[in-house]
UniProtKB/Swiss-Prot annotation:
Homology family: Belongs to the calycin superfamily. Lipocalin family.
Organism, scientific name: Manduca sexta
Keywords: Disulfide bond, Pigment, Secreted, Signal
Main subcellular location: secreted
Alphabetical list of SUPFAM superfamilies matching this protein: Lipocalins (SSF50814)
Signal peptide (UniProt feature, chain positions): 1-17
BP term (GO), one: response to reactive oxygen species
Gene Ontology cellular component list: cytoplasm; extracellular region
Expressed in which tissues: Synthesized only in the caterpillars, apparently by the epidermis and secreted into the hemolymph. The protein is passed over from the larval hemolymph to that of pupae and adults and is sequestered in the eggs.
A Pfam family per the record: Lipocalin
Protein name: Insecticyanin-B
Amino acid sequence: MQRFLVFTIVAVATAAAGDIFYPGYCPDVKPVDDFDLSAFAGAWHEIAKLPLENENQGKCTIAEYKYDGKKASVYNSFVVNGVKEYMEGDLEIAPDAKYTKQGKYVMTFKFGQRVVNLVPWVLATDYKNYAINYNCNYHPDKKAHSIHAWILSKSKVLEGNTKEVVDNVLKTFSHLIDASKFISNDFSEAACQYSTTYSLTGPDRH
């Protein structure tokens, strides 16, 4: 059961059967400049994402970033069949971004003896309302790349002026991301209800 649930993040870091592959190397993408991790910290709701085949069908997905000025961490959670499942990991600015000051960070999760790194690029954010994250992996065996993307919001619903801004931003990245393929998350009261919690990370998880 757990191996199936962990599939989501492992798949993003590697390659999944349901990935859509595009020929050639990852496109040249520029993350946001002057990225401010302190301002970015907080709870982000996953409004929508590009789908992965066979991934968990978690709802009410939230990524919470904490930063005390020196050390950062991430707490990802989602609800499946009344169970709140969560993953805790470390977060740091990507090595090259420490010099360029661009929006790239590394999340490290440990599933027993297995360590998985995920490197989201922040394509756009106003820090207070929305963020658009992006990840691209090149697969030498296929001579192709796969893309993942997420629309994040500090609130459970993306609406009004913020939604308009996000829609316009996605249009500027239409050469990278097919917005029509985004799958929306569910943050309804029913979807977010849970009666127990379960950790996916830790020394006894594999």
